[in-house]
Amino acid sequence: MSTINTDTNEAMPHISVNAQYIKDLSLENPSAPSSLAALEQRPQIDLSLDINITNLSEENFYEVELNIEATARNEKYKLFQIELKYAGVFNLINIDSEQHPILLSVHCPAMIFPFARKIIASCTQDAGFQPLMIDPIDFGALYHKKMSEHQN
């Protein structure tokens, strides 16, 4: 019979997702039902994304929040506007604090983004439109762009 040394497993650096949740969700469908009949062409979609990171009271626990806003328009109507704040609570275990910024800005958002994307797709479909499928986001590129802007 062999024994497993759990001490080495506990010392392994890893990210634990303790919770995921919708903090705020709003969908406006201001021109319905007229806008639903006028969907011959693809609407123009304006999309914005922001990431907020909050250090929670417990050591190495952080809330990472994705703020996603999308507005769809055609030449006649504002079709819909959706705003979602989706967050996760992450515990960075046995990870050097110098690595926290990149993990919290890149890896943690990438872990929760698919869930936020699904919520937006479902809500827009439930509003009578084609589901808004947001393209995958390169959080690493966003992080490096933000870092280079801060250096300039």
Curated annotation (Swiss-Prot):
A Pfam family matched in the record: SecB
Top-rank taxon: Bacteria
Gene Ontology terms: cellular component: cytoplasm
InterPro entries: SecB, SecB-like_sf
Keywords in alphabetical order: Chaperone, Cytoplasm, Protein transport, Translocation, Transport
An MF annotation (GO) of this entry: unfolded protein binding
Major localization class: cytoplasm
Subcellular location: Cytoplasm
UniProt keyword Protein transport, yes or no: yes
GO biological process: protein folding; protein tetramerization; protein transport
Function text: One of the proteins required for the normal export of preproteins out of the cell cytoplasm. It is a molecular chaperone that binds to a subset of precursor proteins, maintaining them in a translocation-competent state. It also specifically binds to its receptor SecA.
NCBIfam families: PRK05751.1-3, secB
Family the UniProt entry places it in: Belongs to the SecB family.
Subunit structure, as described in the record: Homotetramer, a dimer of dimers. One homotetramer interacts with 1 SecA dimer.
Protein name: Protein-export protein SecB
Organism expressing this protein natively: Rickettsia felis (strain ATCC VR-1525 / URRWXCal2) (Rickettsia azadi)
